Amino acid sequence: MHRHRSFRRGAQLFWDTRSEFCFYNETRECADALDQTKVAVKEGTCPVVLSDSGDNPTAGSSQDVRNFLKMIIADPVLSSLEPPLCYQAFYDPKLVEAAFKAGEGNTVNGTLGAAFDKIKSSPIPVNAKVKKLCKAWAGAQNSDMALLDVQGVDVVVTSKHVGCYDPEMMRALGVEPEKLKVIVVKLGYLEPEIRAIAKRSMLVLTDGSTNEIFTRLEYKELPRPMYPFDKDMSWQA
């Protein structure tokens, strides 16, 4: 009985303080995050590390939603940085296979994105230079990896679903992350390895199956009422 009372008190405490929960680090919508990134670059506060949090494979997303990448490519500042912005990483085994067939220094034609989840986004055509290849990298579950120049953005593409938090993934492809101005990782909160590099970091509220704003996800069998969908609901432990 004492244990049950403790559980009830804890549950009631969570409920009573629900409006106080928030992200613990800098969190922004996509367009705002890109604007702030350009401010940081201009001020020399680099590297800036952005978390593509809505498509976080370590939380169960598909690692192939390209919507945020498309915004970056369309930005004339962020798509022309030197050294280039590095985006780590997209799951697309067909594109990786094509990159290995083309070889380093050559051009690969194909599509990027929506290799697994064709609902959250759609593929974009790419005509990309193959900058570097890495076969069966042990740090990413022996995934093959390719570094592609996609319209001025260095994009890491993997043959397997992998966690995108380790800067060693970039180093395996010849990229020195400490020297970059902007890094984007498909991740939520930054892991210590990548956080140690960042001079400024932002969690970006991007699209995907791990969208941090739960009300933006589609639910088919959600019992109602349910918080935060029904803000005015009442509940008692």
Where would I find each of the regions flagged by the language model?
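Extended hydrophobic packing segments that form well-structured cores
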Residues: 15-18, 135-237
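Hard-cation-handling environments
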Residues: 1-152, 156-157
